Amino acid sequence: MAAGTLYTYPENWRAFKALIAAQYSGAQVRVLSAPPHFHFGQTNRTPEFLRKFPAGKVPAFEGDDGFCVFESNAIAYYVSNEELRGSTPEAAAQVVQWVSFADSDIVPPASTWVFPTLGIMHHNKQATENAKEEVRRILGLLDAHLKTRTFLVGERVTLADITVVCTLLWLYKQVLEPSFRQAFPNTNRWFLTCINQPQFRAVLGEVKLCEKMAQFDAKKFAETQPKKDTPRKEKGSREEKQKPQAERKEEKKAAAPAPEEEMDECEQALAAEPKAKDPFAHLPKSTFVLDEFKRKYSNEDTLSVALPYFWEHFDKDGWSLWYSEYRFPEELTQTFMSCNLITGMFQRLDKLRKNAFASVILFGTNNSSSISGVWVFRGQELAFPLSPDWQVDYESYTWRKLDPGSEETQTLVREYFSWEGAFQHVGKAFNQGKIFK
């Protein structure tokens, strides 16, 4: 029987597959998803983690015997038993069929439809309408298959049911209102049957089905839509092409979108930004090498090594420190959705990574939370106005320039960069943090 540790971030639907499978098989799976044991975006980028899981992705599973495996479907398969995998060659093939179908056919339209309602992806009306029709087709396909069946393969729950249910989960919770889903009674019956099994409930809790289809918040995210009068930037700059190959490789590594969240469709959409000239080219050279600090921060102890290095080398004339706070805390509900706001902002600022560093923290609990952070920017002004590509999210935050020499700034930098401290100015407990680097 498998036993080990699952590394993930909170409320990761991909991790649910393995956790539900373990409930059926009896596999002993410990979950590390929050500080201090696992800092998503930090722990999974350390050399030790990457030696075990080269892709840096989560979920990732480390067995008590040292066996390591990543990719959610592979982990779910590993912690399953023979009944879940398919007890005959034919059944096993059908299980793989539905697992593959979930990834190839369900995930893309589900992401296109659901992600904008969660605030983690740009909204495109035509793409959303196409996604709705594709979801309708998929539900109809499932409905026909389940007309004479209780489960997708055989007479018992298998990995096929677990995988497809988890892939459909946010559709049912976020957008499949009664009028939309009523045309698929067999699919609904099967979905409800599965989520009410004790093994599913132990992981998912009580799943509340959507009552009213969630919509894209046009007022809040209108600025994410392309502006017709905004000219396209040039695809590259002479300075960029003339840089040494080693430096270009280092920048590419620093600027690459984090792969570990596995939200492929969302990441592809958010990363598809046009290349632009360097908005910081006009600034004089600085003695502070941000990449070197980032290496210290990633590979050394924050309090004893990285922070002393930061203050010893920080160039207050060439760089500036800023405190940010989300303007609309009353709109923050589920903590995982609040974290998605941070992740989405980081993805949209991908090209700013070479000239910025930040630690942004979610404080509090569901329906009582706040978001704030400390940022390091090249130059003395906020970087966002320098490029239209960076102006999507920053107006949703208040910004206050910090005095590098003040005791308040020293405390803020120490607490936010280390994720440790009293955070007395916040009034809520640390929940989780994300690093922009």
From Swiss-Prot:
<comment type="function">
    <text>Probably plays a role in anchoring the complex to other cellular components.</text>
</comment>
<feature type="modified residue" description="N-acetylalanine">
    <location>
        <position position="2"/>
    </location>
</feature>
<feature type="cross-link" description="Glycyl lysine isopeptide (Lys-Gly) (interchain with G-Cter in SUMO1)">
    <location>
        <position position="253"/>
    </location>
</feature>
<feature type="modified residue" description="N6-malonyllysine; alternate">
    <location>
        <position position="434"/>
    </location>
</feature>
<dbReference type="GO" id="GO:0005737">
    <property type="term" value="C:cytoplasm"/>
</dbReference>
<feature type="domain" description="GST N-terminal">
    <location>
        <begin position="2"/>
        <end position="87"/>
    </location>
</feature>
<feature type="modified residue" description="N6-acetyllysine">
    <location>
        <position position="147"/>
    </location>
</feature>
<feature type="domain" description="EF-1-gamma C-terminal">
    <location>
        <begin position="276"/>
        <end position="437"/>
    </location>
</feature>
<feature type="modified residue" description="N6-acetyllysine">
    <location>
        <position position="212"/>
    </location>
</feature>
<dbReference type="Pfam" id="PF00647">
    <property type="entry name" value="EF1G"/>
</dbReference>
<dbReference type="InterPro" id="IPR036249">
    <property type="entry name" value="Thioredoxin-like_sf"/>
</dbReference>
<feature type="cross-link" description="Glycyl lysine isopeptide (Lys-Gly) (interchain with G-Cter in SUMO2)">
    <location>
        <position position="285"/>
    </location>
</feature>
<feature type="domain" description="GST C-terminal">
    <location>
        <begin position="88"/>
        <end position="216"/>
    </location>
</feature>
<keyword id="KW-1017">Isopeptide bond</keyword>
<dbReference type="Pfam" id="PF02798">
    <property type="entry name" value="GST_N"/>
</dbReference>
<dbReference type="InterPro" id="IPR040079">
    <property type="entry name" value="Glutathione_S-Trfase"/>
</dbReference>
<dbReference type="InterPro" id="IPR010987">
    <property type="entry name" value="Glutathione-S-Trfase_C-like"/>
</dbReference>
<dbReference type="Pfam" id="PF00043">
    <property type="entry name" value="GST_C"/>
</dbReference>
<dbReference type="InterPro" id="IPR004046">
    <property type="entry name" value="GST_C"/>
</dbReference>
<dbReference type="InterPro" id="IPR036282">
    <property type="entry name" value="Glutathione-S-Trfase_C_sf"/>
</dbReference>
<dbReference type="GO" id="GO:0003746">
    <property type="term" value="F:translation elongation factor activity"/>
</dbReference>
<dbReference type="InterPro" id="IPR001662">
    <property type="entry name" value="EF1B_G_C"/>
</dbReference>
<feature type="modified residue" description="N6-acetyllysine; alternate">
    <location>
        <position position="434"/>
    </location>
</feature>
<dbReference type="GO" id="GO:0005634">
    <property type="term" value="C:nucleus"/>
</dbReference>
<keyword id="KW-0648">Protein biosynthesis</keyword>
<feature type="modified residue" description="N6-acetyllysine">
    <location>
        <position position="401"/>
    </location>
</feature>
<dbReference type="InterPro" id="IPR036433">
    <property type="entry name" value="EF1B_G_C_sf"/>
</dbReference>
<feature type="region of interest" description="Disordered">
    <location>
        <begin position="221"/>
        <end position="268"/>
    </location>
</feature>
<protein>
    <recommendedName>
        <fullName>Elongation factor 1-gamma</fullName>
    </recommendedName>
</protein>
<keyword id="KW-0007">Acetylation</keyword>
<feature type="compositionally biased region" description="Basic and acidic residues">
    <location>
        <begin position="221"/>
        <end position="254"/>
    </location>
</feature>
<keyword id="KW-0832">Ubl conjugation</keyword>
<keyword id="KW-0251">Elongation factor</keyword>
<dbReference type="InterPro" id="IPR004045">
    <property type="entry name" value="Glutathione_S-Trfase_N"/>
</dbReference>
<dbReference type="InterPro" id="IPR050802">
    <property type="entry name" value="EF-GSTs"/>
</dbReference>
<comment type="subunit">
    <text>EF-1 is composed of four subunits: alpha, beta, delta, and gamma.</text>
</comment>
